[in-house]
Amino acid sequence: MGLKRFKPTSPARRQMIIPDFSEITKKEPEKSLIAPLKKTGGRNSYGRVTVRFRGGGHKRKYRIIDFKRDKVGIPAKVVSIEYDPNRTARIALLVYADGEKRYILAPQDLNVGDMVMNGPDAEIKPGNALPLENIPVGTVIHNVEYIPGKGGQIARSAGTSCQLMAKEGKYALLRMPSGELRKVPVKCYATIGVVGNEDHKNEVDGKAGRVRWKGRKPHVRGVAMNPVDHPHGGGEGRGKGHHPQSPWGQLAKGYKTRRGKKASDKLIVRRRNG
């Protein structure tokens, strides 16, 4: 995995930094593991915009990813590392000993030809999935479950990981990517290693068109709107006139928006902001 720069033949080319895709296997995606993906343009079933600045973009097919890693005790071989347009990480195609094929998130240091395993008896090496109770303290992990059997939800983006800090009774203590310390049941599965494509954070689109290809539309500032459209709208010049707010009047920039009482509060040992 590396990044590619270009000769400055245009202002966009001068700025652009994109992956070189050297780790990608040259093959079509596995047909049995892709599904149609319908575009919404940020609209809900009523046709109303629920997410602003979405629309257009290149057509995609969804890759069905195995986040549960519930095929226990059967070894699998990595036959390809592939690009997935729906996420920042790369994905790895596994072929199990019984012939079944599944996609997983490709961690760092997982290569074509490697063998991986799921289950309590799996070796501690990148790509293997085990319950937290079977993972040594201090291990770096990703694709961690919140609820046993639900499938991994924590640390799935490119370059992210958690660290197993301690185990006590029914819970394991994790340091989350945000720095938060959180308890998770020890029966939850996690995958060893750091999610691959760690250079994703250094990519630069270089031009507006590349962002449009991803389905993102221009993000209009509130101060550029009329008073009817945004709390920052109107007035002479660019002044807000009051505290920064969202389009719906929610205070921004430092105002805490998390709901007061949640069942998971008792599982958070230390918040990410102290």
Swiss-Prot record:
A single GO cellular-component term from the record reads: large ribosomal subunit
Superkingdom field? Bacteria
Q: Which GO terms describe its molecular function?
A: rRNA binding; structural constituent of ribosome; transferase activity
Establish whether keyword Ribonucleoprotein is in the entry. Answer: yes
Q: Segment Disordered: which positions?
A: 222-274
Keyword field: Ribonucleoprotein, Ribosomal protein, RNA-binding, rRNA-binding
Q: Which residues form the signal peptide?
A: none
Gene Ontology biological-process entries: cytoplasmic translation
Matching Gene3D superfamilies: 2.30.30.30, Nucleic acid-binding proteins (2.40.50.140), Ribosomal protein L2, domain 3 (4.10.950.10)
Q: Which InterPro entries match?
A: NA-bd_OB-fold, Rib_uL2_dom2, Ribosomal_uL2, Ribosomal_uL2_bac/org-type, Ribosomal_uL2_C, Ribosomal_uL2_CS, Ribosomal_uL2_dom3, Ribosomal_uL2_RNA-bd_dom
UniProt biased composition (Basic and acidic residues) = 229-239
Would I find RNA-binding among this entry's keywords?
yes
Q: How does it assemble?
A: Part of the 50S ribosomal subunit. Forms a bridge to the 30S subunit in the 70S ribosome.
The family annotation for this protein states: Belongs to the universal ribosomal protein uL2 family.
Q: Which PANTHER family match?
A: LARGE RIBOSOMAL SUBUNIT PROTEIN UL2M, RIBOSOMAL PROTEIN L2
Q: Which NCBIfam families match?
A: rplB_bact
- Main role? One of the primary rRNA binding proteins. Required for association of the 30S and 50S subunits to form the 70S ribosome, for tRNA binding and peptide bond formation. It has been suggested to have peptidyltransferase activity; this is somewhat controversial. Makes several contacts with the 16S rRNA in the 70S ribosome.
Q: What is the name of this protein?
A: Large ribosomal subunit protein uL2
Which organism is the protein's source? Thermosipho melanesiensis (strain DSM 12029 / CIP 104789 / BI429)
User: Which gene carries the instructions for this protein?
Assistant: rplB
